Amino acid sequence: AFSDAGDARAGSITYNHGQDAMIFKTVGQNERLRIASDGNIEASGNLKTNNLSGRNRITNGDMRVSQRYGTTETTINVNAWHYILDRFKMYQNTDGQATVTQVTSGYAASNTGSGNALRIKVTSADTSLSGTQQLQLTQVIEGFNCEDLRFGTANAKSFTVSFSILATGASAGNVTGTYCVNATNFGNYDRAYVKEYTIDAIDVWKKVTLTFPGCTNGTWGTGNTGGIRLGWFFAGPTSQQGAANQWHTSYKGSTTNQKNGMGVVNNFYFIKDIQVEEGTIATSFEHRSYGEELARCQRYYEEAMISGQSYIGGANHVGIPAKYAVTKRAAATVSWTLDASGNMNGTSPNAIHRNRIDGAYAYQSAAGNGNYYYYYIYKADAEL
């Protein structure tokens, strides 16, 4: 047995010959770890480590997947949610403007963390925000992926958000300051918790760690609906401000300390390695293979080309099937674009005849008898 000097509490490490096991005990001689003769290890508590899989509730946190725009710089739609990189959408309703892109070089290629990042660039400034004006990056975590946190019950669990961020601009004062991240119940938005963090210097990656306590009340989505929505504010809504570090019973986006990142043209923000995990400890970022990350993203959005050929006798229709690579979260909104190399009529199918979570079936009119071939690009959107 052993204890600290002046502390009566003791722990012990013993070898039990009868059971042929090494036993580790802590305060009060409670058994915590046992190594049996067959090599099996039994622990009485949870194993906490930096390399177990399945920790991260965020999809595409390392910003590798960008099905919609690739690395093309894209202006954020005003007054509308706009998906850029997979699973991440942005909202911008200020009097200024900003662009977003996936970057794989420069700051993103530093020796800190992943080699990709999401970059926000202010292209037109708004120096005085009012009402709900904001610039926000968001991901909605599907209920299946967060319902085990038991939000809305007495057993609600804490979760920890970690990410790496870098800001730069014409001068440090343009971007340094206090920023906010909020958590809210998707769809209802009547529970919200705000956390603050600071950007202290420009041109330096900073890892931020924020712990959110479990919310024991309110309605939180489960199953394939939206559960927890997380928002990163680069400019915050003045009419939706609230105190940090407490659960609110109405929607709050940021605190009164929130920096207006839209205030100066050519402010840049880079963010990557976003992770959300159960508990109060931020472990190292969980890297998944590109194929696995892409498949996770395709549950919510997928685009691909389909082609085929069919003989039509008379003015009839050609059936066009789209079999998804990954089963969708829900029946998707599907758009189709006819490739110019085909010989079908029109630029998109006449109608979608079947729409399921595993695929869709449309038909396209033909001009008359003959062989018809088609090349279609479809986009299936089942985002939250």
Set out the residue ranges of the language-model regions.
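Short, mixed charged/polar active-site loops
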Residues: 8-10, 30-32, 190-192, 205
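Extracellular and organelle-lumenal recognition/adhesion modules and their flexible linkers in secreted
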Residues: 40-384
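Low-complexity, small-hydrophobic/phenylalanine-enriched stretches
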Residues: 1, 13, 22-24, 28, ...
